[in-house]
């Protein structure tokens, strides 16, 4: 794949949607084709699953068992990768997703107290081992981010302060375990300060991505040349 895959993570209210749109505009201004998507709900199937996950069955408050919840997220993600993410990457496009598998690891393994090994194994199977090139973790105290919410709470957002605190810590633990993929940004800063940190990092990431593609093409050309010369001989 020659595309670029970027995900945004963090507890609710940290400003992911705002920064996703800033990044989209920035990349499109540079002539890149950008696909913006989200989890759950990035496909038609995903929208139906999102309704169940965030609002319950028929909008009711019946709780979903942790294992059932994890399987629903995995089903959404499997369809998301197959239908939207992987095809776009294969076309050489940039994919930006508002949440990906790290949300499952943080919310289900951290917040819901399932084991990280269970959730990671399920998520990697569902995505056929597809990980983002960069994950921006917008970090903020949930007590502060909660005050930013401008809509009625969904099932996840109303889970309580202890759940949100465990989820935040789970995100930070994930970032510490994969420092080459994660870029942690203090989301309590202004929108412009957060964007400046993302902009500086994405410039480096784009340069590295172009260099990697050039290397692959050079190797491919050398290999093709060797075959041609062999045929002449």
Swiss-Prot record:
Catalyzed chemical reaction(s): dTMP + ATP = dTDP + ADP
Presence of keyword ATP-binding: yes
Single GO molecular function: ATP binding
GO CC, one annotated term: cytosol
GO BP terms, alphabetized: dTDP biosynthetic process; dTTP biosynthetic process; dUDP biosynthetic process
Enzyme class, first EC level, given as a word: transferase
Superkingdom of the organism of origin: Bacteria
A Pfam family it matches: Thymidylate_kin
Keywords: ATP-binding, Kinase, Nucleotide biosynthesis, Nucleotide-binding, Transferase
Protein EC: 2.7.4.9
Residues annotated for ATP binding in this entry: 10-17
HAMAP family: Thymidylate_kinase (MF_00165)
Family: Belongs to the thymidylate kinase family.
Described function: Phosphorylation of dTMP to form dTDP in both de novo and salvage pathways of dTTP synthesis.
NCBIfam families reported for this sequence: DTMP_kinase
Name by which UniProt lists this protein: Thymidylate kinase
Source organism (scientific name): Bifidobacterium longum subsp. infantis (strain ATCC 15697 / DSM 20088 / JCM 1222 / NCTC 11817 / S12)
Gene transcribed to yield this protein: tmk
